[in-house]
Every structure is written in structure tokens, then in C-alpha cells.
Amino acid sequence: MRWDIDSMMQITQQMPGEARFGVAVRPKPVQKESNIGFYLVMLAMLFEFGRPQDVVPPLKALPIPTLLDVSLFVAVLVSGKATFSNTQTKLWMALLTFMALWVPFARNNFWALMTLKEMTLYFFFYLGIVTFVNTTSRMQKIIFMWLGVHAFLGVNGILHHGQGVGGWLGDENDFGMEMNVAVPVAFFMYQAATTQRAKLLYIILLGLIVMSVVSTSSRGAFLGLLAIGSYCWFYSPRKIMSLIVGICLAGLVLIAAPQEYWDRISSITDDSTMESGTAGQRMFTWGIGWEMFLANPVFGIGQANFPWTIGEYLGGRTWQTKSLSGRQAHSLYFTLMPELGLVGIIIFGTMIYLNYRDTRVRQFFPIGQHRMGQKRENEERKDPELERAALFGNAILGGMIGYLTTSAFISTLYYPTFWILMGLAVALRNTTQSYAVAQSDIAVSSNPEQKVSLWGRPRSVRLRH
């Protein structure tokens, strides 16, 4: 079933001679929407995350991801549905403007410009999702597509000992972060499945994704996986079944993971790791990053300029006789703070809050379906489409939790993960809103004699695009 209002039945006005409460219902002819924009979104998803150009090198002869993103932007403008009124969209445009202003003043103008270009292309991708993923069926298809791509990534990662296909997914820590994002999506899709075959498929996919995280031997990915597991159980409507699934997955990891993996994980708290290992080096780098932020608290030093500026703040200090000039911050947060300052922190933090709000789609359900204290009655009245949307919201929010926790230890601010998840969150809110409003209109028109109490009256919902 589609969720866009235009595809629902239209209620005509009462005709002369009809009963007082008679209602004539006839379908309104709807011009079929072109699928070109949506197909471009699917292709962009494949090339951005699946990266076939890294598997088949001849594909690199053309900048296919760039061409797809630009084509998406053109398709959005041509569609006549382009709108920039959404709050996340406005914030993103403000961020791009801020980055553009930094280009001529940043220490390394080239990387500031290249990062601005990448973020602009992600913005085009985001607009394509918000514009063309406008029905329930399309939302479901894009999530299936996204999971299918990550299934391929998982198999490839396991076969290559935790290494990604290439590009921004080449490093095992970055690959572990991306697969952590996929864990809650597969988990809640399993809960949304209505057939045993589909449930089995998602359970297998979930096990595959978890084992791909294990294959990276990434300690940061392991900590992120623990946070995601807690999130999935907490937000699951079936706590006991989810606990059983979690125990089975833990058993799989215990059986399949080699001893070398556990030796590496156990080194997280070793004194050697904290004092002279990678953890100590990260904390030393973060300390320098904090000094950079304090010296440039409002506007920062410019996007992608941490490696080119850290040398100024070292003041002759070294890490075990080695200079860290040119080193990345190895943290989402210690990239954001010194590079974009309070301006970037406020924009990014507001985006996180709005994404959280948009994934809580039960706020758009008809009054009564999400009320507490009416469980038995609600079980009969639940709309499966809305319940599935709620699970999709949990999946997208869980993906963001996976990104935000695992990225505490790697520099992922300018990767597409967060920005595309934001597009999915906005699209989910819009489709759920449209469907809920349309269902409320149909419910009222189908029983015009029914008295609606003050507390049961459908709320007016203002659609935001």
C-alpha cells in the first residue's frame, strides 16, 4: 500500500437526492509518478555504499557516484517537488554556506574545497531521498536495497579479514563502523517481518553482519556493538525473544571468533594500550584537538584542516619521539569541535535531535493507537503499516546510535553514513505523516454519523517536506 495522500480514495461532496449522511466515493484519476528519480536514488545507494567501482576498476573511468548525485539534484528540480522548508535541509544549507566561507581562509584550501564538494554531493543525495522516497513501498524498497548492499559488504569483509571494499570503507575501523550501523536495521527488519521465511532471512543476515564486525578485530567497533545490542533490546517490543536472539548471536561470536580476536579485545583496558598503545595516542591527539578548539571556539579552523593545523599546537611535543603532524583526530567529536567550532557543533547537534524526533513516528499515529492503558482494544485496531513504520524508525535511530558510538574513535564526520541516515529519517516521517492523515480522513468519511469525542478527535497535522 502506498502512503502518499494523492493515491488514496477521494471523498466527493454530497449529491442532490442522496441520504442526509450519504457519501459518494469514487477514485480520483491519479497521474502515475515517474520512477526515474527513485531509480537514481537506488543507484546512488549502490555506488556510494556498495562501491562496485572498487570491485570492477574499469568503472572508475567515469566519476559515476558524482554523476548520479548531480543527476539526482537535476531530477529533484525538474520534478517540481523540490522544497527546502524542512529544518534539517535548512541546517544543511547553513552548514554548506559556513564551509564555503572557510575555503579561502583555511590553511589547506584544497582539502577544504574538496570536503565542501563531497558534502554538497551528499546534500544532493539527501534531497533525492527526501523527494522521491515518498511512499511506504519505496521506503521499504530503499531499506531492502541498503541492507542488500551491506550483506555484500559483510561477505566481502569476512573474506578479506575485516577490510572493506575500498574508498572510505577500506580501513577495518571504518568498515566496522558501517557494519555496526547495519546491525539494528537488520534486527528491527526481522521484527517487522510477517513471514517465517523473511524472519529466517533477516536472522541469517543479522548473524552475517555481526560476524563481519568481528572480522575487523576493531576494539572501537566492539564497544559500539555492545551499545547497539543494549539499544536493540531496550527498544524491542518483544523483550524475551530479543534476549534469546542476543544470546544466540553472542554464542555465535564465542564459537566462531578466534582467540586472537579475544586477545585484542581484552587489551582495551591494558595499561600498555592506555599509556603507550593506540588508545594513549588517541587521547594525546584528542588533548591537542581540545586545545585547538579552545583557541578557535566559535568558527573553528575549517573543514578537513585538523591534520594540517595540529603541528602548530604541538609546540615541540611528540608521542614517543614521533611527531603527530598530519595525523587525523581519530574521533568524530574531536574532528567536529576544532574544525567547525560552536557553529558546527550547534548545527550537527540540532540535526541529531531532529533525526531522533523524526524517527519517533508514533507521534503521527491516530489518537488511541499509541495511547497507554488501552492495550487490548489497540491490538485489534493496530494498522500493520504504521507498526512497521515504527520499527523502521527504531532501525534508523539504531543506525545513528551505531554511528555515533563507534565514531567516537574514528574520524567519520565527512562520510556519507550520517547524512544518508538523516535523509531516511526525514523521508520516513513524511511518508508516515501522509499515510496517517489519509487514513484518518478515510476513517471519518466512512462513518459520518459516528460521534467523535473531544479526546478522540483526529489531530490536525501539518505536513513538512
Give residue ranges: language-model regions.
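Membrane-interface helix caps and helix-loop-helix hairpins in membrane proteins
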Residues: 55-58, 105-114, 161-169, 214-215, ...
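Long extracytoplasmic/lumenal interhelical loops at the membrane interface
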Residues: 269-287, 295, 299-340, 359-373, ...
